[in-house]
Amino acid sequence: MNRITKSKEMPVYLFHQGTNAHAWELLGAHRQLNGKTSFCTWAPHAAAVSVVGDFNGWDAGAHPMTRLNDQGLWGVTVEETHDYDCYKYRIITGDGRTLYKADPFAYHTQTPPENASKVYRLGGYRWHDADWMTKRTGKDARSLPVNIYELHIGSWRRNEDGSYYSYRQLAGALPGYLTEMGYTHVELLPPTEYPFDGSWGYQVTGYYAPSSRYGTPH
């Protein structure tokens, strides 16, 4: 993203008004089918911003970002990227400090304690819940029983070697347990990315990134 196009003018306006409920479509890293990735971040007090990562050898001068407006949006398009490329924003502050920051709008990240963001294209996922969606049609949810099971993915169950269950393993093991115990719904403790393994995930560092402890977004 090297400039604000006509189609982006309203999303940008709403973002600065604090009313853009789809800001993730504007900011972050958006990888296209041709391998290009558009990066956009908000750093209103920065003197300069660049994106550094696996795709440019972490070279601070390879991909400087353009300040897109007076409110502090910065953007750049990188020509050749791959899924899982790690990256950060290199920010020069107004007082001359150099900071390396992860992308708060990233879809995927390194597994903590590493904290770089990762390029990841979300498209192409195939859902397999058509039968369940069909059965749900016509039912009045307000008249059905509700029994909610609150679950922290990392501590509910682990493999024999102590490693975390993956999202796939959880999907295989959890429904039968819930049915046996009489639960109708699941409330996940924060499944988004967070830094400290000893917590339940409330120190969120990536609201758009499912925790990489348990697998990829797909």
Regions found by a protein language model. Give the residues of each.
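Short proline/glycine-enriched turn/loop motifs at strand-loop junctions of beta-rich domains
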Residues: W42-V49
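Short beta-strand elements bearing conserved aromatic residues within extracellular beta-rich modules
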Residues: V49-V51, Y87
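Aromatic-lined carbohydrate-binding/catalytic grooves of carbohydrate-active enzymes
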Residues: D161, Y165, G176-H218
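The feature marks proteins involved in alpha-glucan
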Residues: M1-S38, L68-E150, S155-G162, Q169
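Short, surface-exposed loop motifs enriched in S/T, G, D/E and P with embedded aromatic residues
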Residues: G61-L68
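Short amphipathic alpha-helices and their capping/turn segments at secondary-structure boundaries
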Residues: K135-G138, A171-G182
